[in-house]
UniProtKB/Swiss-Prot annotation:
ATP binds at G155, G156, A157, G158, V159, G160, K161, T162. Belongs to the ATPase alpha/beta chains family. HAMAP family: ATP_synth_beta_bact. It catalyses: ATP + H2O + 4 H(+)(in) = ADP + phosphate + 5 H(+)(out). Its main location: membrane. This is ATP synthase subunit beta. F-type ATPases have 2 components, CF(1) - the catalytic core - and CF(0) - the membrane proton channel. CF(1) has five subunits: alpha(3), beta(3), gamma(1), delta(1), epsilon(1). CF(0) has three main subunits: a(1), b(2) and c(9-12). The alpha and beta chains form an alternating ring which encloses part of the gamma chain. CF(1) is attached to CF(0) by a central stalk formed by the gamma and epsilon chains, while a peripheral stalk is formed by the delta and b chains. Produces ATP from ADP in the presence of a proton gradient across the membrane. The catalytic sites are hosted primarily by the beta subunits. Pfam families: ATP-synt_ab (PF00006), ATP-synt_ab_N (PF02874), ATP-synt_VA_C (PF22919). The gene is atpD. Keywords: ATP synthesis, ATP-binding, Cell membrane, CF(1), Hydrogen ion transport, Ion transport, Membrane, Nucleotide-binding, Translocase, Transport. The keyword Nucleotide-binding applies.
């Protein structure tokens, strides 16, 4: 066993000296196991740099409290590896692949894969484009998701990114029976706990593996936990040929953890204090998320936008990798429209007649045109009032408000807050509903009948109740 000693500790970054010139390779895992007066010290480091002088600089995967200079460190000879396969379903893990739920250890004979690996080769990639139906009207109509694509959920604090992710996990498991992997990267422990219990109650947990590196953990764990989740998802794709969903909440925290470690590793900061390797790190993660000839990983990533500034290097770098974006807008939450997805800012490269079909494409574009015209008229309405509009514009406003409310919907995962049952709406019903609104079939129904409903049939029922 190759052994070294700790020579310097700078918070989560630790230098280790190996005698005899036998240095561990970059990304190798080093371990410390010893007892001290505070109890057991059980640490894992990952080698990040070779400094010369027989010394390596490493990043700790858990807190370095109680670690002292001179402590003996062992080189495991391989990268951090985590359990994969069916044994991971229904379980909760940390960055190292240790089970952190109360269901005992993972059996020793379960296969473990290293978290660092190459992206699939060019010839293995699949080229066919298929739509993933989510059952959420605003998403399916205006910014549809692609199987094997990468989707960004953008929004500031408290506009509903995590709730939307929970609803997607629920819908995909219930309607498609698909496997999901959830990576909680640097988010609140309470939210992870709530998600776990909600998924246990609804039975979705049996189809899900969960990995957490939360806000209270050192940056090493937060930076690597996304790779842990991805490794588990890759096994289901490559070995079992599954279509897997990988949820990352929140991809910004992955970048944030990298920037915390970067300065301590001695790298020069770049724009806004981020790490100079920002684009490389993001690329290494994102390029592994793809469709191959065997199966696909569709990734849905919540992206926190610092101070709602989309030009910040972290969200801007993430944008480059995405196939679709779902933008959440605070203004819509204030109007009571949930999910608060901005129908004009959200985009998808799948929204083209070749992929979604001519009718869907036409309806989606007409919906966007109507909403855009309404947005342009809002200034006139604010200054002069509705009466000053032409008859044609009055009709646009009339229909746009109904469309805006019909884009809202009740979620299964929000039943305990709203007291109303959630709804899953197939794409063809969504397209039909909006087409009929645009044609003016429901111009006589009250606006409020369109709020927080599923299909157009629910609108008609609501209207009957209101008029009764």
């Amino acid at each position: 066993m190759n052994k070294g000693r700790v020579t310097q500790i700078m918070g989560p970054v630790v230098d280790v000296k190996f005698d005899g010139g036998k240095l561990p390779e970059i990304y190798n895992a080093l371990t410390v196991k010893q007892s001290n007066e505070n109890g057991e010290l059980n640490l894992t480091f990952e080698v990040a740099l070779h400094l010369g002088d027989d010394t390596v600089r490493t990043v700790a995967m858990s807190s370095t409290d109680g670690l002292v200079r001179g402590t003996e460190v062992e080189d495991t000879g391989k990268a951090i590896s985590v359990p994969v396969g069916d044994a991971t379903l229904g379980r909760v893990f940390n960055v190292l692949g240790d089970a952190i739920d109360l269901d005992g250890e993972v059996p020793a004979d379960v296969r473990r894969d290293p978290i660092h690996r190459q992206a699939p080769a060019f010839e293995e990639l699949s080229t066919k484009v298929e739509i993933l139906e989510t059952g959420i009207k605003v998403v399916d109509l205006l910014a549809p998701y692609i199987k094997g694509g990468k989707i960004g959920l953008f929004g500031g604090a408290g506009v509903g990114k995590t709730v939307l992710i929970q609803e997607l996990i629920n819908n995909i498991a219930q309607e498609h029976g698909g496997i999901s992997v959830f990576a909680g990267v640097g988010e609140r422990t309470r939210e992870g706990n709530d998600l776990y219990h909600e998924m246990s109650d609804s039975g979705v947990i049996k189809k899900t593996a969960m990995v957490f590196g939360q806000m209270n953990e050192p940056p090493g764990a937060r930076q690597r936990v996304a790779l842990t989740g991805l490794t588990m998802a890759e096994y289901f794709r490559d070995e079992q040929g599954q279509d897997v969903l990988l949820f990352i909440d929140n991809i910004f925290r992955f970048t944030q953890a990298g920037s915390e470690v970067s300065a301590l590793l001695g790298r020069m900061p770049s724009a806004v204090g981020y790490q100079p390797t920002l684009a490389t790190e993001m690329g290494q993660l994102q390029e592994r998320i793809t469709s191959t000839n065997k199966g696909s990983i569709t990734s849905i990533q919540a992206v926190y936008v610092p101070a709602d500034d989309y030009t910040d290097p972290a969200p801007a770098t993430t944008f480059a990798h995405l196939d679709a974006t779902t933008n959440l807008e605070r203004r819509l939450t204030q109007m009571g429209i949930y999910p608060a997805v901005d129908p004009l800012a959200s985009t998808s490269r799948a929204l083209s007649p070749e992929i979604v079909g001519e009718e869907h494409y036409e309806v989606a574009r007409q919906v966007q045109q109507t909403l855009q015209r309404y947005k342009e008229l809002q200034d006139i309405i604010a200054i002069l009032g509705m009466d000053e509009l032409s008859e044609e514009d009055k009709l646009v406003v009339h229909r746009a408000r109904r469309i805006q409310f019909f884009l809202s919907q009740n979620f299964h995962v929000a039943e305990q807050f709203t007291g109303q049952k959630g709804s899953y709406v197939p794409v063809k019903d969504t397209v039909r509903g909006f087409k009929e609104i645009l044609e003016g079939k429901y111009d006589d129904l009250p606006e409020d009948a369109f709020r927080l409903v599923g299909g157009i049939e629910e609108v008609i029922e609501n209207a009957k109740k209101m008029m009764a």
